[in-house]
Every structure is written in structure tokens, then in C-alpha cells.
Amino acid sequence: MAQAKKSVDIKNIRNFSIIAHIDHGKSTLADRFIQMCGGLQDREMQAQVLDSMELERERGITIKAASVTLYYTHPNGQEYQLNFIDTPGHVDFSYEVSRSLAACEGALLVVDAAQGVEAQSVANCYTAIEQGLEVLPILNKIDLPQAEPERVIHEIEEIIGIEATNAPTCSAKTGLGVEGVLETLVDVIPAPTGDREAPLQALIIDSWFDNYLGVVSLVRIKDGRIRKGDKMLVKSTGQTHIVTSVGVFNPKHTETGVLEAGEVGFVIAGIKDIFGAPVGDTITLSTTPEVASLPGFKKVKPQVYAGLFPIDASDFEPFREALQKLQINDSALFFEPESSDALGFGFRCGFLGMLHMEIVQERLEREYDLDLISSAPTVVYEAVTKKGDTIYIDSPSKMPDGSVVEDLREPIAECHILVPQEYLGNVMTLCIERRGVQKDMKFLGNQVSITFEIPMAEVVMDFFDKLKSCSRGFASLDYNFIRFESSSLVKVDVLINGEKVDALAMICHRNDARHRGIALVEKMKDLIPRQMFDVAIQAAIGAQIIARSTVKAMRKNVLAKCYGGDVSRKKKLLAKQKEGKKRMKQVGSVEIPQEAFLAVLKVER
């Protein structure tokens, strides 16, 4: 649907993002903005308008950044165009936030007036300040009886270090004070700079694949303008495409026919090649190929690797296509083909964390209708061989033999944790259990900010869940990779009837290996169905067996027909049965159910 484009002077445009910790009310505030500026009629309104993915609505979290263009009339009578981007709050998606911020001049830092500042709001806020944005703190949930605005304003100034005495307060749920937030943001956030008459220069902030339209790109126009029918040039590929549609989301997909400097909107050029318009690339017109490329985004490195395999081998090609389509939309996803003796052909995928992995697997299963099975996730280890070569190990099967390795190193994460004083002891105990080393501690009002260096393998698994449960949900975490450090690491193999099962192997610290091995074989014992012969499950480090359990055979009562009978007759029948079971064991193979592969993930420490 096309509509007459309102031409707004560049000084009346405001581009901003909303950043906050999980559950501090970003998406609800976005809903209120849309409602007040008449983006949608009341009947079209629903909670979390911008979280369009089913998964986002179910879990109540934002995964993808979404952009919206609204028109707002200020009390001074001027009309402003607001382009805002709703960003995710979860630590696994912080790269989405930094991408969104590149398109803005300002950011609204939403803080829950009852909960106060949390680690993720601090991390995202620093990202915004580094990129030179104007940060406007806002206190949300002011209608709650437990809201303490004075304490929270003090916390924002203490912990983050930005002026917050005049921070607007609002309740996104009831709509109280939201008008004031809009007024303040128009006054505080600077207008974009750019020359509408200069040659076109635009940054691709995000892109996704539509089966009918091809690649849809979300762009921020720095200079110049782009119209429907223009011939555009993608700088990195050097290819030209005819623009078929240009417009904005308000939040409905609305064609406007032209986008001008300072604006954020979508461009569709019928690009069918999945890699035709990479995120972070610059587009210009084919008549001005000399326009400089804008600085893109730094590539994010995956922190967790896991094998994903289709249950049905014939799904391998559709699976590859699905991953490629998902990768346009999710630049942090990495994958390469892998084969496993136990699971067949699949892909080794790299993710930013466990939540990211879960989301990707769930999106593949829902949106592309695939049945997938995953192997145990591992982090990337660094090994130095005796010849002096450095190799990176992202899967236990790639672990070289101990005789050729000089040094094994594991990744260390720097974790910043914010926790109320009364839970400090529990959190410290948890960090030390996870082989953490304390680096710093600051008391800020009622909150304590602690910094630990913890091995990445301990952080990405279930550290976040454990941290939440030992602090009743009050602690918050932000972490980033800092370096590799030498460590005593071993590979634990799982043998079933003497044969190694590659998909069940894991790499862990030598001190943990024994009890993790025992816990794993005990768990496997419950999950592998009983066979007609004994099944031995063993955990081994190299040639040394560290744990064993046996799934007992099902057996028929061969003595049932003997009644009184002679004892030697009974012995003969039992010996015959034993002989048969032995023969069966030599030729029998054991089916391992999917749950058994997942057991590796769930082994408690």
C-alpha cells in the first residue's frame, strides 16, 4: 500500500533506540509510542506489537531489533518524524543492540523503577556512549507500589555515571507520563546530519529473506535519497539492482516511494541471492560508484559450538538452505558441514550462548519444518602442538592426541555481576565453584558490583540459570571473552559395549572429569532401553576407564520347565542361555535414543 510521503525537514527527524535490561518494559513502551502517534488503530493493537516472531511472543523476550517510523506533533506545533528501533535486552543478543545503535543519534535507557539498574542496562548503555549517542534515562513502572524513583536515580548516577536528576518518569503499562517522555526525547536527542542533495550513501542495518520479495534490507540513509526505480549498487559485491520498493514500517509495511537523508526504512530490489546485500554494507546509486563505504559492524565471534543433525537424512539439503536463510537475518550464526558416525551428516554451528542456540534450533524446527537433533555444546579451546602450531578445537572429535600437544588453553570470560548485598555470599560461592577468580568488588548503595574471571565453558552452560536461582532472580550478568589460559583439560569418551560414540564425548577440566563421567554413565543407564544382552556403558580418559555401569539383559526363565529336576540339568540350561547371550552380544548393536544425547547437557555438577 502506497501513501503520500510526508516530507519532513532533516532537523525534525529523531532516530533513537530503546535499550534496557530484560523485562524492564522496552516493548511495552514501544507499544505506547505507536498508540499515541496513531501508528495503529486501537483494534489492531496487541501487546508487544514489534515482537513479530511467534517465539518472541511466547517467551516474552525481544530477539530481533524492529524499526518503526511515527509522526509526532510537539506541543510547540511542529511535526517530528520519529524513527525508533526496539532492541533485545538479553546478553546473548547484545550484538543486535550495537547494530541498531549505529543507525541512531540517541538512545532511551529504560530502567525499572522498582528493580533498579541491572548489568545488561549498564553494558548496553556503555555501548551507546562509545558510539557517541545521547543517552536519555527513563524510569518506567512508576505505578508499582514498590517503585523507588529516588533510589533508582541515585543508582543510575552512581553505577552508570550519567546525569539522571531530571529523568522523565512514566508507566508504559498505563500510559502515564509517556507524553512527557516523547516531549523530552524530541528536545534532548539531536537531529541527524546529512545532505539530501549529495550522492546516496546508506548503511544496511539488518536484512531478512522473504520468499516472494527476495532480500528485504533495513537501511539508514546518511546522505542523498533513494527512490523506487533507481539503480542501486551494493558496495561489497559490486552488483547493481533495480529498486522495486522503498518505504517505512509504521509498524505496518508502508511504501513511500522515496527515502531521504536521516531516515530509516526498507529497500527491496528483488535480490534473490541470499548473500546479495550483507548487513553492515553500504549502498549507493550505480551512477556514483566512487562513494566511500561506511564503517560496517565488527564480526561477532561465536562462543558456543554444537552439532545440529537432521533426524531424516533426506532433510540435509533443506536444512542447509534453512541455515543460509537464517544467517542473513542472524549474522552471528556460523555453520560448516560435519559428519558423525552416530548421527550422520549435519552442520557444526556456532552460537553466542545457550539461549541463542535454543532460539536458532527452535526457529529452524518451526519456520522450516525440520526435525533436528543436537550434540553437546562446547566452547572453543586453543591447543599448541609440540611443533609450535596453534589449533582451535570447537568439537571434542577434533581434540588432538595428548602425545602431540604441548599446551591446552581454555577461553576465560570476564563476568560483571550486579547483585543486592543480601545475596552476595551465594553468588560468590557459585562463582568459586565454577573455578572463578575474583578481580574486583564495589559497593554501590544497596547493590554490589563484582567482577570475576570464569572459564567460558562454565559460564555458557547453565551459569545464568544458577545465578538467577541463587539470588532469587535479583542478580544480573554481563560477560565477554578476554583471553585463552592454560588449563588441565581432558577429553572424556563414552563407550557403549566397547565402541566409542563420538557424539557423546565431552571436554572438561581434569578435576571435574571423574564425577561428570560417573553422573553421565548413570544417566545413560536409565535412558538406554534394555536389550537381549548386557550393555556396558563406560566413560574413559584415553585408555583409563573412569566410570562404568551396565544395563542388564532381559532374560527368559529357562528353568520354568524343570520342576524338581536335577541341579546339573538346571546348570546345563543356564550355561546354554549364557552362551547364546554371549553370541548375541558379539553381533548385536544398540540403538541410542535422542534423550541420551541430550543427557550430556544436563549432567549436574
Curated annotation (Swiss-Prot):
Matching CDD domains: EF4_II, EF4_III, LepA, lepA_C
Coiled coil: none
UniProt GO molecular function: GTP binding; GTPase activity; guanosine tetraphosphate binding; ribosome binding; translation elongation factor activity
Domain tr-type G: 11-193
Gene3D superfamilies: 3.30.70.240, Elongation factor 4, C-terminal domain, Elongation Factor G (Translational Gtpase), domain 3, P-loop containing nucleotide triphosphate hydrolases, Translation factors
Protein's UniProt keywords contain RNA-binding: no
Residues at which GTP binds: 23-28, 140-143
SMART domains listed in its UniProt record: EFG_C
Main location: membrane
InterPro entries per UniProt: EF-4, EFG_III/V, EFG_V-like, EFTu-like_2, G_TR_CS, LepA_C_sf, LepA_CTD, LepA_IV
GO CC field: plasma membrane
Highest taxon listed in the record's lineage: Bacteria
Membrane protein topology class: Peripheral membrane protein
EC number from the UniProt entry: 3.6.5.n1
The protein's name in its UniProt record: Elongation factor 4
Organism: Acinetobacter baumannii (strain ATCC 17978 / DSM 105126 / CIP 53.77 / LMG 1025 / NCDC KC755 / 5377)
Gene: lepA
